[in-house]
Amino acid sequence: MSTESAMFLAPIPTTDAVPPVIERLVEQHQAAWVDQDSIDDWLAGGGDCVLFIAGDPVRFPECVDVAVVLPELQRVFFNGFRIGVAKREREHEDVLANRFGTQRRPSLVFLRDGAYVSVIAGMRDWDEYVREVRRALAMPTSRPPSIGIPVISAAAGGSCH
């Protein structure tokens, strides 16, 4: 095997460590740690919520920037939403991301009274974040995006008529 092809087989570096700025969301900004076992209880608190799915900070370093901006966005909107942080273990993040139809990290999943509203994926400029959050807080709830497999009835005919 050549050295060039071996480079492509090297594992992608990751870390299980939680960056301090993400820990501060829970310790100083009243965010809650959330996983697949606690999400329904957290959502039962009602109102507007933002679930932060950070991803691995080595693979997705912008998650640290989003963690810094999130409490500032909360303040701009007069604490108009609660913050949940997906537990850092990948299996927790993946289950929550799949449930709410987001595959990109980091993601801010907007929920209202337990139902999906919208998602903002990746880091944005401040003005764009403010616009997108304002839009999300005004949107009605909807179904989370799916993986794109069409749902059809077994009894459906071959045409649309």
From Swiss-Prot:
It comes from the Bacteria. Belongs to the HupG/HyaE family. Keywords: Plasmid. The keyword ATP-binding does not apply. It holds the Pfam family HyaE. InterPro entries: NiFe-hyd_mat_HyaE, Thioredoxin-like_sf. The keyword Lyase does not apply. CDD domains: HyaE. This is Hydrogenase expression/formation protein HoxO.
